[in-house]
């Protein structure tokens, strides 16, 4: 369930709804640990920049990253859209997400909270995730 919405760029309700729908599908893919569904939302040359990792370029690297993530954790998060800005065939979206993460190795539930930046690009008339970066808003764990 996506919350919130603000548009500080050029007004284009169709684009905003298309991108909002992609983010809803992405949220669902994360919450169902569905690599195939997540990857379907990415374009032909994606770059995924998860926290504490090098940038992962290309569909094979992004697929492998999601497979590894979903083997390690199960997410239960809700995204909030703060801003969508269109610039021709590119758009950027600033979001935050919050919820819980189950860590498979320990079977522990921990709080999940992130800021995200998505860059979308139109490919064959469809918006696709082109670049994606996230960083936790939780304080670092103390020893």
Model-flagged regions — what are they?
Residues 5, 9-37, 47-143:
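A beta-strand edge to alpha-helix "cap/lid" segment located at domain peripheries
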